[in-house]
Amino acid sequence: MSSSFGKIFRVSTFGESHGGAVGVILDGCPPKLKVDINLIQNELDRRRPGQSDITTPRNEEDKIEILSGIKEGFTLGTPIAMLVRNKDQRPGDYDNLEQVFRPSHADGTYHLKYGIQASSGGGRASARETIGRVAAGAVAKQLLKTFCNTEILSWVKRIHDIESDINKEKISLKQIDSNIVRCPDEKVSTEMIERIKELKRQGDSCGGVIECLVRNVPSGLGMPVFDKLEADLAKALMSLPATKGFEIGSGFSGTYLKGSEHNDAFIKSDDISKLRTTSNNSGGIQGGISNGENIEMKIAFKPTATIGKEQKTVNAEGKEVLMKAKGRHDPCVLPRAVPMVDAMVALVLADHLLLNHAQCDLINK
Amino acid sequence: MSSSFGKIFRVSTFGESHGGAVGVILDGCPPKLKVDINLIQNELDRRRPGQSDITTPRNEEDKIEILSGIKEGFTLGTPIAMLVRNKDQRPGDYDNLEQVFRPSHADGTYHLKYGIQASSGGGRASARETIGRVAAGAVAKQLLKTFCNTEILSWVKRIHDIESDINKEKISLKQIDSNIVRCPDEKVSTEMIERIKELKRQGDSCGGVIECLVRNVPSGLGMPVFDKLEADLAKALMSLPATKGFEIGSGFSGTYLKGSEHNDAFIKSDDISKLRTTSNNSGGIQGGISNGENIEMKIAFKPTATIGKEQKTVNAEGKEVLMKAKGRHDPCVLPRAVPMVDAMVALVLADHLLLNHAQCDLINK
Amino acid sequence: MSSSFGKIFRVSTFGESHGGAVGVILDGCPPKLKVDINLIQNELDRRRPGQSDITTPRNEEDKIEILSGIKEGFTLGTPIAMLVRNKDQRPGDYDNLEQVFRPSHADGTYHLKYGIQASSGGGRASARETIGRVAAGAVAKQLLKTFCNTEILSWVKRIHDIESDINKEKISLKQIDSNIVRCPDEKVSTEMIERIKELKRQGDSCGGVIECLVRNVPSGLGMPVFDKLEADLAKALMSLPATKGFEIGSGFSGTYLKGSEHNDAFIKSDDISKLRTTSNNSGGIQGGISNGENIEMKIAFKPTATIGKEQKTVNAEGKEVLMKAKGRHDPCVLPRAVPMVDAMVALVLADHLLLNHAQCDLINK
Amino acid sequence: MSSSFGKIFRVSTFGESHGGAVGVILDGCPPKLKVDINLIQNELDRRRPGQSDITTPRNEEDKIEILSGIKEGFTLGTPIAMLVRNKDQRPGDYDNLEQVFRPSHADGTYHLKYGIQASSGGGRASARETIGRVAAGAVAKQLLKTFCNTEILSWVKRIHDIESDINKEKISLKQIDSNIVRCPDEKVSTEMIERIKELKRQGDSCGGVIECLVRNVPSGLGMPVFDKLEADLAKALMSLPATKGFEIGSGFSGTYLKGSEHNDAFIKSDDISKLRTTSNNSGGIQGGISNGENIEMKIAFKPTATIGKEQKTVNAEGKEVLMKAKGRHDPCVLPRAVPMVDAMVALVLADHLLLNHAQCDLINK
């Protein structure tokens, strides 16, 4: 149900933030795919807490354990189960929150829906849940790299009102990871880091925008009508905690253009399968199907709901209470959300790669 | 596959724009629901072509035929099949397009994916495909009205750069439908209509933003992790033709706020199930689950790709050609997209209503 | 929901027995597949009522109408919608049944579940619902024939206690269709026809066993654990009206053998992909995956529940009533069930062919 | 994909027989359900190897570890992840099998499909995979017991040719578990145990039939057309290792009856929701929907493929080899298959309970 994603390359995650473990089952992965476990661990390291001064101080090593589906570095075609134990749990930190609803957090809605909640912390609403996504996404990335040389790059575009101006042509993973905020603009990244630290000192938080670029996308991925590639990407990214908006290609700003300005002109080509366009307002997708251009997206992340400042709120009886979060939390989720965006995009593309292969490559090739 | 949507309240659409018919099967609808066929026809009338000077002149009555699942105005609990015949087909209009890829349209990607295309017109990429969605959505609306008194209202917020300022408290369907552009701001709507007519005269097109408001949403709809309510809404709306962006609640602009500014404070309440917040930056959803506040969304629609102006493009051999669309098309899709937005939102909410009932109302009640 | 079948080669059927029409949407079919409409009509003719003295006299031409997804004899890769109008409806025939539950029929359970029923006749429980299955199955058969030269043959093995002894090596469609009971044993078929006629005269009915043989099954179809090929075949066939039992390979009788007797020995082969076995107790499937041998199944069909004899039963108030069915019904469903079995088997195999291609043929080829 | 089962009460299993662990995620379980972990462990003990002289000597404690979704004995409504470590692994036992295909086992088909296999033992085809099913089924059993007082009882009906005659009215779990073969007929069970021991001594194996009875089934579970209750039960049970046949109610033997003999007459009743029938050839299901009578099924299990006797077979190069299994295996799977049957039936019924509640209890109650 709600903890599964994908049609035939399909992940199912589990785990509460302060329970025994979090993890994922990845089913439907092709057999005999070479998988480098270090690359999985590396993505988890990019998303792990405690990685820098501007993330939550919760200190988790987040060491991945592979329980099934991989043998001597190759996939078996059977479910790949991956597990990370929760270690640095401090349920006590949230004791004062147990029956208090943090404003704009999931505490209240979980209580209204289920009438019961995980002991403490965010339960399934915690960012720890994304460990399973990131681990499975790291396998998806390797699948895409192996078959299509596809490269997924996400970075912090804006923090609060500090915006970077990135040359997408040249951007690389190395640049993105060169600083702790994951904005590949050296100068601007320093300002961003300062802003986050300042807000943290104030017991406050901020949000921003992550941009994602996918290179070497095969044309033909995606489908008409409901399972359009941009629709599945939108769902995937809007399922990440704290997201409030999604844009593909020209997004909202494209709506200020006329059709004659917005249309992406095709460039003549001897090889129709390698058709390119002069501009990319479409963001690499037309009619729900990739056209071979880069996929380009932007995702809005709201400021972290859990803040140190005192706030008025209510408890599970509806009575007014004052609260001040003691739990460890990120003053800004974006630096750690970068690998989550990568992962969700990889999961969508891997699923659509297999789906397209299933339906359209039986006859053509 | 790609033409089905929903988990247990599930629609499957079919039909090409110039084929025999378009339609939908709606499966999983509760039995004994009173359904007014006139309300279904009314929604189709709101989306039908030829309804005004600013829509495509293709003249289709779009008369709904119910083939199954309803008896004397009540649902049977079995699949509801609904059909609309294509009548005013002029495949000849698109003869010059058959092997020509309209820029930023689905022609090229369909060809790359399938290697074969519907005779003419947009095939499944045509807005005619949405007839099935709108018909099924009209049933979903009645289900939501019957069980929760839920009301879904969408309207044109902006056309090109002409923006309206709407008082959401007072807005009504009557106001929205009081003018042909479906912007409930009388003065601004006149400007919008003028702009669309002007661009039409120029053989050009424009886009804009539709806003959607849902009142009386029961709390508890939606689920953690992947099937968050906002994620399913994002997918539903980004699956509509011509969409480029989606926002829930504060959207992209909310990312300029600090956490202390963005958080929606709860108001104390004796009845916890009727909890409200002082602001609604969350847009009615927290942690993927509705909190009982209004759901508020914005959707970006790009300018129509098919324009009358001459454009350079390529044909299926990759050779450069000049084209000038003769087919009938909308200079701006937004007025007709309003009922499509309503429909997709209704389908998502109806499905989540049943899903929540399945999992969470067995014990509670 | 319950009216859809298949994961990526997916059918959704609709229609009540005495409503406007019955039909099907087939989604996920590969594009550019050559489809002969006559072969679809031919399968419908094999299942249509009124085809002989031993079937229901309801006279329906069951002429197929293709609404979408096929252009000039080739699939577009988009949903194929197919429709058959109900013509020879006589709702009056069932007037005396409207609130009476036929013993062992779906009348009672539909009433208990939905609290409302189709006007008359069996609604979705009628054999007319299978029209959509047979039409879609005829497309699946052509897909399987085109890609793998796969041939599906079903026939009547036993009627009541009259059993045939068939040489499976030589059996052909022509033989099967050479008589109206569809038993390819000329002598025994005459006895079967006599038995059915005799029971019909008595206002009674009978059941029996259909056998199914699939030749040229590619190895590798099916999956471990839940979606084993035999499990999906069992579900497909047990979803046909009136089925009470399913066997693959040695079935129940194989349980009387010892392992050393039951095991199918492999025959050495230079080409491992063409591995064969000396016996076929496995029925062509091992561990849920096809091994390249013929798939062999048997399906038990109970005697028709609707009979002309007077029976004691109850009405919707639970009161005892006497009933004697006036509606037109089959004294034995098996002759018309043969094409239904073919269709369901074809749908399962086509779906698994695409699924296997998706997961396992990306790397191998 | 293939390792998931259920629509909204959904399990996903993972794990190879000789990997790190096997387990399951159960998603969609209602919140606030009281779950007794001992009852889960108890079901695992019923299926664990090494429990008696007539099962495999592999000695696994199979101690369940709950990783998420349960807090202080109550479900949270979030995914319940359960894990069992593999301890008594002896991959060496199967060394001589690594590239040898055991006749009638999954070795050959896994190799043909995936081109790669788990290190040794059966991988996903091993009975160890069913641990996840049994653990999740034990939760489903508690759900059914809590809401409907439903009781699922399975037992060994026949071993090889030794058949028991059971009085279904009186049968109890205590009787079933009173002997190691799980046949509640004391005298016959002794013969069965002797037969199994004798065949084990000969290095041979046997199969048989398990019968399943479900009491207190609410009417209205199941759906028309494809997701008929008996169809989902057939799939569930035919997905268990070694199954070759499935019967509901009268099964194959019912096909020897006339309609007038086979029909189950309704008994008049003041309360229509408690309608009963004089006989139960339907096996508790009519038209795909439960009628409130007991559900009755029979499942055929073939003799274990892995035997100690020397057999001729082939290796992965297609060359002929002689083999004699050294690995520990069951001479007869039925005693341990009893809790597997219980589990699969529970999973199907729990899913259909929620599905029926979702669609049909919104209006009625």
UniProtKB/Swiss-Prot annotation, chains A, B, C, D:
The protein's name: Chorismate synthase
Record GO cellular component, one term: cytosol
Needed cofactors: FMNH2
Self-association state and partner proteins as the record states: Homotetramer.
Organism of derivation: Prochlorococcus marinus (strain AS9601)
Enzyme Commission code(s) on record: 4.2.3.5
Family: Belongs to the chorismate synthase family.
Metabolic or biological pathway, per its Swiss-Prot or TrEMBL entry: Metabolic intermediate biosynthesis; chorismate biosynthesis; chorismate from D-erythrose 4-phosphate and phosphoenolpyruvate: step 7/7
GO molecular function: chorismate synthase activity; FMN binding
InterPro entries, sorted: Chorismate_synth (IPR000453), Chorismate_synth_AroC_sf (IPR035904), Chorismate_synthase_CS (IPR020541)
Function: This reaction introduces a second double bond into the aromatic ring system.
